[in-house]
């Protein structure tokens, strides 16, 4: 395991909402929710910290957000402007290193082991980047500094907003032991529920389990979690990373025969895929359905649409059609997955925040 790298994860604080509050003084100090009209279909893209105090969070239906925060200010947002500001932030990053891996408009990994300013301390680089972003753009960012991407990303969320958390190789295992396992990469709702049933709530709980036992209970997730909780991750910062597909899949706790359960899963996946596509500023043209039967036979079916889309309803309709064509209801399903491929950048003026 290479512990000599100096990795920073920068995560802008409530990015879209912060840009709006910066540009519109009337929004400052008020619960601002980006996601469109709460009386129509849509979900929250992001919200200000004032709105978060009421329990509002991203991916929540706007109608639910309105109930939690009746005095909230709802706006559609301006994606083209957020892209412009994101590019300004990346220009600041490039003053320090060319090894930059953007994850979305509002976050990125930076490898500053060999940085352009010859600074020996990654912590000082992170602080200077935070200060520069605030001074030049009037926005705050949180930073995590460590020797690998996994720990740096967790650390950036530790002292939000505008905080910085440094985790050295010597501190890594103790730091990870206190972290809820729901914060670990790859732990979604289904895996979190399995971990909860196993009595695993924190990194410390996770560390008590052997590698074999975790793999037996969680399969490939167990393999990765065993390494992550020990700070073992050698993934490099990849400036050429380009997502070729966006998808979601789940392995059911019990094999499923009911097509309605499968349809419900696809609907949830479509919403999640839509959210990720919009964050990546992409849309796709090919929908892929994956089914794994109880005997571990796996099939994939794909449908190429007439036009590119990032709309959950269109993605779901295509997936549901593939399900009808593929599933007879005679054999139970162990795993179901939905992926959108054939991606290309979205024309920003056509991005629909309201129908996220």
From Swiss-Prot:
One of its GO terms (cellular component) is cytoplasm. Mg(2+) binds at residues 11, 106. It is an enzyme of class 2 (transferase). Binds 2 magnesium ions per subunit. GO terms for biological process: DNA-templated DNA replication; error-prone translesion synthesis; SOS response. Keywords: Cytoplasm, DNA damage, DNA repair, DNA replication, DNA-binding, DNA-directed DNA polymerase, Magnesium, Metal-binding, Mutator protein, Nucleotidyltransferase, Transferase. Its EC number is 2.7.7.7. Disulfide bonds: none annotated. GO terms for molecular function: damaged DNA binding; DNA-directed DNA polymerase activity; magnesium ion binding. PROSITE patterns: UMUC. The record marks 16 as: Substrate discrimination. It comes from the Bacteria. Its main location: cytoplasm. Its cofactor is Mg(2+). Belongs to the DNA polymerase type-Y family. Poorly processive, error-prone DNA polymerase involved in untargeted mutagenesis. Copies undamaged DNA at stalled replication forks, which arise in vivo from mismatched or misaligned primer ends. These misaligned primers can be extended by PolIV. Exhibits no 3'-5' exonuclease (proofreading) activity. May be involved in translesional synthesis, in conjunction with the beta clamp from PolIII. Monomer. HAMAP family: DNApol_IV. This is DNA polymerase IV. It comes from Listeria monocytogenes serovar 1/2a (strain ATCC BAA-679 / EGD-e). The lineage of its organism: Bacteria, Bacillati, Bacillota, Bacilli, Bacillales. The gene is dinB.
């Amino acid at each position: 395991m290479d512990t000599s790298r100096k990795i920073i994860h920068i995560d802008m604080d409530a990015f879209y909402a912060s840009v709006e509050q910066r540009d519109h003084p009337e929004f400052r100090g008020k619960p601002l929710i980006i996601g469109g009209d709460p009386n129509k279909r849509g979900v929250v893209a992001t919200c200000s910290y004032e709105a978060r105090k009421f329990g509002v969070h991203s991916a929540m239906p706007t109608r639910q957000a309105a109930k939690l925060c009746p005095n909230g200010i709802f706006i559609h947002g301006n994606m083209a402007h957020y892209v412009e500001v994101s590019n300004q932030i990346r220009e600041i990053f490039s003053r320090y290193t060319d090894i930059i891996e953007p994850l979305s408009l509002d976050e990125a990994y930076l490898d500053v082991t060999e940085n352009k300013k010859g600074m020996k301390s990654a912590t000082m680089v992170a602080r200077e980047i935070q200060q520069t972003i605030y001074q030049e753009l009037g926005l705050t960012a949180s930073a995590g500094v460590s020797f690998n991407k996994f720990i740096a990303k967790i650390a950036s969320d530790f002292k939000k907003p505008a905080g910085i958390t440094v985790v050295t190789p010597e501190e890594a295992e103790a730091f990870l032991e206190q972290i809820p396992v729901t914060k670990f990469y790859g732990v979604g709702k289904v895996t979190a529920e399995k971990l909860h049933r196993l009595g695993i709530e924190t990194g410390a709980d996770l560390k008590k389990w052997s590698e074999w036992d975790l793999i037996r209970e969680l399969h490939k997730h167990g393999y990765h979690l065993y390494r992550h909780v020990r700070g073992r991750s050698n993934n490099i910062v990849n400036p050429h990373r380009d997502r070729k597909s966006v998808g979601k899949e789940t392995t059911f706790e019990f094999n499923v025969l009911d097509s309605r359960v499968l349809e419900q899963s696809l609907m949830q996946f479509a919403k999640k895929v839509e959210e990720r596509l919009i964050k990546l500023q992409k849309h796709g043209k090919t929908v892929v359905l994956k089914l794994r039967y109880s005997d571990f036979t796996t099939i994939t079916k794909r449908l190429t649409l007439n036009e590119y889309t990032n709309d959950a309803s269109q993605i779901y309709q295509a997936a549901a059609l593939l399900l009808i064509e593929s599933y007879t209801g005679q054999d139970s399903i162990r795993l179901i997955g939905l992926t959108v491929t054939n991606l290309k950048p979205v024309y920003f003026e056509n991005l629909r925040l309201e129908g996220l």
